[in-house]
């Protein structure tokens, strides 16, 4: 994707230029490019925005020309976390671009939903209703439309949501709190009911996630076990989101089901890659690194790339590094 008309590097902070150069260079190791991306994401997500915010967003978007589907999908995810309207045009362009990888387009559409701006509804509805689009794109846009409508509704203001341990902007909010104690079997029933709208099922998914954190919460293991059943869902999109949630939770009880998903050669690449990255976040658990190394030469590129990044993340977990990021000089630490 070509940079936008407003994309200029003139007068940009040298740290951002260094990170942008690493991120957009095909000769840099993938793991190093991911670390550069997460450094830029930090600057792009600053609230309130600073003079570094827009150049960081533009630097992230500049890498959409990469041939790596894994990297591009992560770019889209990061832009969706910025809470910044400057990210919208880049994401809309990627979502509409049928030449782009499906996984990348899906993530761009999901990111538009996360940002919540109503001017994305027209594009998302058109993709949702286009019978020539893949199930992954149509399902993603269905959820994104519902999320934007919810975000801008009166009903949202009336809902009481449990405070989450996670700062991520999710594809759907958790189910609203009720007067009674949350019933995991009831939420699980909603999660697994394929007759319900995907947005509602995603709300159940994120409600279960919040009941599984922190890991020593009395409901945690039961919530993880309920979520694991979602890895058998007919929708690849749904299965990949379960794996993503497991990556957030870092709960050891998820390791068997993540290992099974990664090991299944007939599973969709977007699910296997998410399972690999989730295992990377559990890299300090016994046997996880050995499992990941088995797939370094997997036939599927996105799985191989994910394992490289996952092993780098596992190394970071073991070393107890403060942040999974690239620090080119002292300047970024103060940014």
UniProtKB/Swiss-Prot annotation:
<dbReference type="InterPro" id="IPR016024">
    <property type="entry name" value="ARM-type_fold"/>
</dbReference>
<feature type="binding site">
    <location>
        <position position="74"/>
    </location>
    <ligand>
        <name>Fe cation 1</name>
    </ligand>
</feature>
<keyword id="KW-0408">Iron</keyword>
<keyword id="KW-0963">Cytoplasm</keyword>
<feature type="binding site">
    <location>
        <position position="240"/>
    </location>
    <ligand>
        <name>Fe cation 2</name>
    </ligand>
</feature>
<feature type="binding site">
    <location>
        <position position="274"/>
    </location>
    <ligand>
        <name>Fe cation 2</name>
    </ligand>
</feature>
<feature type="binding site">
    <location>
        <position position="241"/>
    </location>
    <ligand>
        <name>Fe cation 2</name>
    </ligand>
</feature>
<dbReference type="InterPro" id="IPR027517">
    <property type="entry name" value="Deoxyhypusine_hydroxylase"/>
</dbReference>
<keyword id="KW-0560">Oxidoreductase</keyword>
<feature type="binding site">
    <location>
        <position position="106"/>
    </location>
    <ligand>
        <name>Fe cation 1</name>
    </ligand>
</feature>
<dbReference type="GO" id="GO:0019135">
    <property type="term" value="F:deoxyhypusine monooxygenase activity"/>
</dbReference>
<keyword id="KW-0539">Nucleus</keyword>
<keyword id="KW-0677">Repeat</keyword>
<dbReference type="GO" id="GO:0005737">
    <property type="term" value="C:cytoplasm"/>
</dbReference>
<feature type="repeat" description="HEAT-like PBS-type 3">
    <location>
        <begin position="200"/>
        <end position="233"/>
    </location>
</feature>
<dbReference type="GO" id="GO:0005634">
    <property type="term" value="C:nucleus"/>
</dbReference>
<keyword id="KW-0503">Monooxygenase</keyword>
<dbReference type="InterPro" id="IPR011989">
    <property type="entry name" value="ARM-like"/>
</dbReference>
<comment type="similarity">
    <text>Belongs to the deoxyhypusine hydroxylase family.</text>
</comment>
<keyword id="KW-0479">Metal-binding</keyword>
<feature type="binding site">
    <location>
        <position position="273"/>
    </location>
    <ligand>
        <name>Fe cation 2</name>
    </ligand>
</feature>
<feature type="binding site">
    <location>
        <position position="107"/>
    </location>
    <ligand>
        <name>Fe cation 1</name>
    </ligand>
</feature>
<dbReference type="GO" id="GO:0046872">
    <property type="term" value="F:metal ion binding"/>
</dbReference>
<dbReference type="InterPro" id="IPR004155">
    <property type="entry name" value="PBS_lyase_HEAT"/>
</dbReference>
<feature type="repeat" description="HEAT-like PBS-type 5">
    <location>
        <begin position="271"/>
        <end position="298"/>
    </location>
</feature>
<feature type="repeat" description="HEAT-like PBS-type 4">
    <location>
        <begin position="238"/>
        <end position="264"/>
    </location>
</feature>
<comment type="pathway">
    <text>Protein modification; eIF5A hypusination.</text>
</comment>
<protein>
    <recommendedName>
        <fullName>Deoxyhypusine hydroxylase</fullName>
        <ecNumber>1.14.99.29</ecNumber>
    </recommendedName>
</protein>
<feature type="repeat" description="HEAT-like PBS-type 1">
    <location>
        <begin position="71"/>
        <end position="97"/>
    </location>
</feature>
<keyword id="KW-0386">Hypusine biosynthesis</keyword>
<comment type="function">
    <text>Catalyzes the hydroxylation of the N(6)-(4-aminobutyl)-L-lysine intermediate to form hypusine, an essential post-translational modification only found in mature eIF-5A factor.</text>
</comment>
<feature type="repeat" description="HEAT-like PBS-type 2">
    <location>
        <begin position="104"/>
        <end position="130"/>
    </location>
</feature>
<dbReference type="Pfam" id="PF13646">
    <property type="entry name" value="HEAT_2"/>
</dbReference>
<feature type="binding site">
    <location>
        <position position="73"/>
    </location>
    <ligand>
        <name>Fe cation 1</name>
    </ligand>
</feature>
């Amino acid at each position: 994707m070509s940079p936008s008309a407003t994309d200029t590097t003139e007068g940009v902070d040298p740290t951002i230029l260094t990170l942008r150069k690493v991120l957009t260079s095909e000769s840099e190791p993938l793991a190093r490019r991911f670390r550069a991306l997460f450094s830029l994401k930090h600057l792009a997500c600053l609230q309130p925005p600073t003079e570094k915010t827009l150049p960081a967003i533009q630097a992230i978007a500049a890498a959409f020309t990469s041939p790596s589907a894994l990297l591009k999908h992560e770019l889209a995810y990061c832009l969706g976390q910025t809470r910044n309207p400057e990210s919208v045009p880049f994401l809309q362009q990627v979502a509409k671009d049928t030449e782009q990888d499906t996984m990348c387009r899906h993530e761009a559409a999901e990111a538009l939903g996360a940002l919540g701006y109503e001017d994305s509804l027209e594009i998302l509805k058109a993709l949702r209703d286009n019978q020539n689009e893949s199930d992954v794109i149509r399902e993603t846009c269905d959820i994104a439309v519902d999320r934007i409508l919810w975000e801008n509704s009166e009903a949202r203001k009336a809902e009481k949501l449990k405070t989450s341990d996670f700062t991520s902007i999710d594809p759907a909010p958790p189910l609203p709190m009720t007067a009674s104690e949350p019933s995991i079997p009831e939420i699980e029933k909603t999660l697994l009911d394929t007759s319900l709208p995907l947005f509602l099922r995603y709300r159940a998914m994120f409600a279960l996630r919040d009941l599984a954190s922190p890991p020593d919460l009395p409901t945690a293991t039961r919530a993880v076990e309920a979520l694991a059943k979602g890895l058998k869902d007919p929708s690849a999109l749904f299965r990949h989101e379960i794996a993503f949630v497991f990556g957030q939770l870092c709960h050891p009880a998820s390791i068997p089901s993540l290992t099974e998903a990664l090991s299944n050669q007939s599973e969709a690449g977007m699910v296997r890659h998410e399972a690999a990255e989730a295992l990377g976040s559990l890299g300090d658990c016994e046997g996880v690194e050995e499992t990941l190394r088995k797939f370094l030469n997997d036939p599927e590129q996105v799985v191989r790339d994910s394992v490289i990044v996952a092993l780098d993340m596992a190394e970071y977990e073991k070393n107890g590094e403060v942040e999974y990021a690239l620090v080119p000089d002292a300047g970024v630490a103060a940014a």
